[in-house]
Every structure is written in C-alpha cells, then in structure tokens.
C-alpha cells in the first residue's frame, strides 16, 4: 500500500482507502463518535430542561399600580400546544396596554422542557416587558388554577390592582374569579380549531387579539 494512503473503517466501509492528510478528519474511532454524540445529547438536555426560576412580586410604584394578567400558552399562542407561534396581533395589544401604564404579568404552567428561551421568545416577538411567573413543581403544573390564583393573591397583597385578565382555559378563569377580577374585565381567547371558548366567567369570547385592539385603544382607560 502506498505510504501516503491508509485503510480506514467507517469511510466507505472497511478497507476503503484515504490519504494520510484526510485520515485525521475521517478516521474517527467509534468511541470518538459516541463521545461527540453523548456530549450533544447532554447539552441539548440541559438546555431544553432549563427551568425558569421563580420571579419576585415587586411593589407598585406611584406611577404604576395597576396590572393586566394573562396566560401564555393558548392565549398568546393559537393553541396551548403551539408554544413557538405567537397569535396575530397579540404583541400589539399588549404593547398598547403597556403604553397606557399597565404592568403586564405573564403566568404559565409550561413544563420545564419548553421553558428555556421563553423570555427570548417574548422579546423576539415584540411582547412588552413584564413579570414572568412559571410553575416550579409538578404539583403546581397539575393545579394551574391554584398556582395562578396564588400568584395573583401575592400581587394583591403587595398592593397591586388587578385591572384586566386574559386566558384561554377554564383554569385561567377560575383563578381570575378567585382573585375577584370583575367579569367585565376578563376576556377569553378561542383556541385555533375550537368552536367556542372554554367555560368560565368572562365578558367576551374573542376570536383573536387583532379584533380586540380597537377596544383596548378606545375603551380601556389609561392607568397613568
């Protein structure tokens, strides 16, 4: 065999020949390949399961004392399983509320696997800054209404007025009712593919955010 050519397993099969200059790139052993694979899988697992830590409830300020609370999955996205697709007009609607002086409070019981990158997703899709409260345990995720009601109770104790609320599931509306947010200030979002909104106490079932923007701009007063 030519001194500049060597046999290499894994490149064209056993016995295939490559030059010595290529062998450093192509003649990886099985253990090398497996090490790279395990590293990639491990890194993906760590990234994918990174859980967002609990957020503090800040006190209201003289210039901001009212909050708008809302669910994320199914409310800012078309369905609760479409975690990467924003609803049309959702960011515009929330930015309008933010400009009026309302603090935006995001609530979610999303599983840890899909929590990583949530802050970046909100920012990338143009949603305004706000408090982001994520369920920390399986127990909290299993009882979404209780988890969200507890967060809202913490805001109320801190002195916030819970002015408006948006959601897509019955558990959202249960939490809002427990927080004593008036029915006239609670709105439901219909999920994609559903014939109607889920049961609950709310003023209206919205097809989407775009149709609600005019209402926000004309009917919801400034909180400043």
Model-derived regions, located:
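Asp-based phosphoryl-transfer active-site loop
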Residues: 61-81, 176
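Non-catalytic pre-domain segments flanking phosphatase-related domains
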Residues: 25-28, 34-70
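Glycine- and small hydrophobic-enriched segments that form the cores of compact globular domains
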Residues: 67, 78-81, 87-91, 106
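Short, basic, low-complexity termini and linkers enriched in Ser/Thr/Gly/Pro
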Residues: 9-31
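Catalytic-core regions built around general acid/base machinery
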Residues: 89-100
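C-terminal cap/substrate-recognition subdomain and adjoining C-terminal extension
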Residues: 100-103, 111-224
